[in-house]
């Protein structure tokens, strides 16, 4: 699996995945290179809303976004916020994933969201999923994950347009697979 770059793709945990952080998860890969990989789990809302988070940060928030869920992004740096967003715009600390999507960790994006002039589409997580050099490739070789490519429209829908509980099935559908049937039949060839 040398020279494979999964940046901008999705990982779906295989049914045999027992790690509680990743079982039945969909992870969006934000960066993948020789040093390792990092991504955000996009289908695990936690018991916190945008209003709750902004209250903790002393940021006023009004309007329809107050009930927007905050997500568990992965087990690394759980005390830190990560904002996947579209469009890119200019923020203090943004990792450009592609021409449309960025991952920002600076507070200026949260301030802009609170004031109503942040990105149109965003997903906020606490924590991220990280892999050391070669670790993700090894997990892929052991069939821990399915990799899923998506068009920009499909990617936008998976990241920002679907409720969390529909993301595993919708991601698998891009491969022509039904997760429930796949889970039942895995290992019964």
Curated annotation (Swiss-Prot):
Family annotation (PANTHER family): UNCHARACTERIZED PROTEIN YQGE (PTHR30327), UPF0301 PROTEIN YQGE (PTHR30327:SF1)
UniProt cross-references to InterPro entries, sorted A to Z: AlgH-like
Protein name according to UniProt: UPF0301 protein Mfla_2099
Cellular component GO terms held in the UniProt record: cytosol
Family classification: Belongs to the UPF0301 (AlgH) family.
Pfam families attached to this UniProt entry: DUF179
């Amino acid at each position: 699996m040398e020279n494979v770059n999964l940046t901008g793709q999705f990982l779906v945990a295989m049914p045999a995945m027992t790690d509680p952080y990743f079982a039945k998860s969909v992870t969006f890969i934000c960066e993948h290179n020789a040093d390792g990989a990092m991504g955000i789990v996009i289908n695990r809302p936690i018991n916190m809303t945008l209003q709750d988070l902004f209250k903790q940060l002393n940021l006023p928030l009004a309007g329809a976004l107050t009930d927007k869920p905050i997500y568990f992004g992965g087990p690394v740096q759980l005390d830190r916020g990560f904002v996947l967003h579209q469009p890119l715009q200019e923020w203090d600390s943004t990792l450009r994933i592609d021409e449309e999507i960025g991952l920002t960790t600076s507070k200026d994006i949260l301030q802009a969201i609170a004031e109503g002039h942040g990105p149109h589409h965003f997903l906020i997580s606490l924590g991220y999923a990280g892999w050391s050099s070669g670790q993700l490739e090894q997990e892929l070789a052991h069939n821990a994950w399915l990799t899923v490519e998506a068009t920009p429209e499909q990617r936008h829908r998976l990241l920002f347009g679907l409720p969390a509980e529909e993301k595993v099935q919708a991601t698998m559908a891009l491969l022509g697979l039904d997760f429930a049937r796949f889970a039942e039949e895995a290992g019964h060839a």
